[in-house]
UniProtKB/Swiss-Prot annotation:
Pathway: Isoprenoid biosynthesis; isopentenyl diphosphate biosynthesis via DXP pathway; isopentenyl diphosphate from 1-deoxy-D-xylulose 5-phosphate: step 5/6
Protein name in the entry: 4-hydroxy-3-methylbut-2-en-1-yl diphosphate synthase (flavodoxin)
Keyword Iron-sulfur found: yes
Cofactor(s) the protein needs: [4Fe-4S] cluster
Residues that hold [4Fe-4S] cluster according to the record: C280, C283, C315, E322
NCBIfam families from the UniProt entry: ispG_gcpE, PRK00366.1
SUPFAM superfamilies: Dihydropteroate synthetase-like, Nitrite and sulphite reductase 4Fe-4S domain-like
Enzyme class: oxidoreductase
Gene Ontology terms for molecular function: 4 iron, 4 sulfur cluster binding; 4-hydroxy-3-methylbut-2-en-1-yl diphosphate synthase activity (ferredoxin); 4-hydroxy-3-methylbut-2-enyl-diphosphate synthase activity (flavodoxin); iron ion binding
Organism of provenance: Mycobacterium leprae (strain TN)
Biased composition (Basic and acidic residues): 371-380
Single GO biological process annotation from the record: terpenoid biosynthetic process
EC number annotated for this UniProt entry: 1.17.7.3
Amino acid sequence: MNMRLGMPEAPAPGLAPRRITRQLMVGNVGVGSDHQISVQSMCITKTHDVNATLQQIAELTTAGCDIVRVACPRQEDADALAEIARHSKIPVIVDIHFQPKYIFAAIDAGCAAVRVNPGNIKEFDGRVGEVAKAAAAAGIPIRIGVNAGSLDKRFMDKYGKATSEALVESALWEASLFEEHGFGNIKISVKHHDPVVMVAAYEQLAAQCDYPLHLGVTEAGPVFQGTVKSAVAFGALLSKGIGDTIRVSLSAPPVEEIKVGNQILESLNLRPRSHEIVSCPSCGRAQVDVYKLANEVSAGLDGLEVPLRIAVMGCVVNGPGEARDADLGVASGNGKGQIFVKGEVIKTVPEAQIVETLIEEAMRLVSEMGTEKGSDHCSETTRSGSPVVTVN
């Protein structure tokens, strides 16, 4: 009997092209489809504590934050905005709820943008004209930030709860009011704690407008839960070309949000990769403590921005092959580790020296990339892939 196996299916396509949006500037950071997707976070300091706020902004900047947001619930916070905006190395957005007067305070202070929550600012619709005029005069954008937890009562009454349709209708209604006053320097967010609702809302929004979109799963939770929720939601949207800025909301220090956000973008090849550690889940074949080895190598290379592929392998099944394919790697077994550089074994070291040796060799490769191959090589390597550390 003849069997027709047919032709193999074509592989699934890669990421969709970026959704075409209007372009805007948040300080010196471009936002929109012509620009790299930016990563944001929000200070957890009291904004009126200028020193503490600037210190946290400096930490976020070092971690790779592109844009930072600060709260402004009180007049003393508004009074501090000018100094914060003046000394911050990255653009400062002011987050406004309840009191419209703080919108104008933020604009007057020279902040790079203002986020407004139309669901809880008093009589906001009637103040849109004033806000549009002030923002236009200052040349700054407005983010219309709709949130499931504070949805405009009109849309809550209409839909019964914060559905994706309710979030989108609220955002587009407010945007239309700004447009009536000739102001289109707008970006939008429609955040929900449920990634499924959030994804649906952004997909609907993307189909109905060309505003840049700021992605976020609101109240995502502690680090593990929030990372999973954000990665799932952002991956679903970014793979379709939807999203121009992101914030990973975590119940954790803000620097953790930046680490996760950057890693999400790197994993989708939407940002040049730094080093990456690929490690297996371990099994009964492993002849070293894979978890300990992977964590120690990761900690030792923390902050390394050069794209190196580093393989840390725990057994002989995939170890030698993975190590040979990497820029740098180790295949471990019998209390020893074979160190590979560019596919060649350069030495064998005792297990206790594996981490130290890998870090030394990584630094040597970084030095060679800078002095012998030049910045063009680094740029090309960054585009083609990331430094990968593989632990099997």
